[in-house]
Amino acid sequence: MSRIGLKPIEVPQGVEITVDEKNIVTVKGPNGQLSEKIHRDITVETEANVINVVRPTENKKHKSLHGLSRTLVANMVEGVTKGYEKKLELVGVGYRATMQGKKLVLSLGFSHPVEIDQPEGLTIEVPSQTQVTVKGIDKQQVGNFAAKIREYRKPEPYKGKGVRYAGEVVRRKEGKTGK
């Protein structure tokens, strides 16, 4: 059984946390500000430099919400201090990525280039033509945008061509063997 919800969250210096009456937790830090609505049954207690997330009962629903709420708050604290990044690699002949102003332009073997607008709160870097880095303070937003980019051309199992996360292992298949 997981006991993630019972762990206290360390608050680094320079991070300010507020909880209002509607159970909305706001975290301000050097990189920005994030807020998240926590379920009404879960209470968030802030002390000097420690946050405790408390559940009212031991039933299954409250235990699940407890771990979720604690992780959401911990991710917000880490996001406003360190930030998150997701790296993507483009594998395939002619697969390229470039930045044109605030747009990410991908050449992925389609008859047209794929243009994706940079969302608010995220920064996109293209260190080389085959690498894309998505950075931001909101872990969920970074992951969703990286998944959106990957969705345009997932790695295929025969040659491994496509957009993949850095370090992702693509399971390869053997092609058909002729007679």
Curated annotation (Swiss-Prot):
Keywords in alphabetical order: Ribonucleoprotein, Ribosomal protein, RNA-binding, rRNA-binding
Gene3D superfamilies for this protein: Ribosomal protein L6, alpha-beta domain
Record PROSITE patterns: RIBOSOMAL_L6_1
GO molecular function, one term: rRNA binding
GO term, biological process aspect, one: cytoplasmic translation
Coiled-coil features, chain-numbered ranges: none
Cellular component, GO annotation: cytosolic large ribosomal subunit
Key word Ribonucleoprotein present: yes
Ribosomal protein recorded as keyword: yes
PANTHER family: 60S/50S RIBOSOMAL PROTEIN L6/L9, LARGE RIBOSOMAL SUBUNIT PROTEIN UL6M
Function: This protein binds to the 23S rRNA, and is important in its secondary structure. It is located near the subunit interface in the base of the L7/L12 stalk, and near the tRNA binding site of the peptidyltransferase center.
Subunit structure: Part of the 50S ribosomal subunit.
Entry similarity comment: Belongs to the universal ribosomal protein uL6 family.
Protein name: Large ribosomal subunit protein uL6
Lineage of source species: Bacteria, Bacillati, Bacillota, Clostridia, Peptostreptococcales
Encoding gene (name): rplF
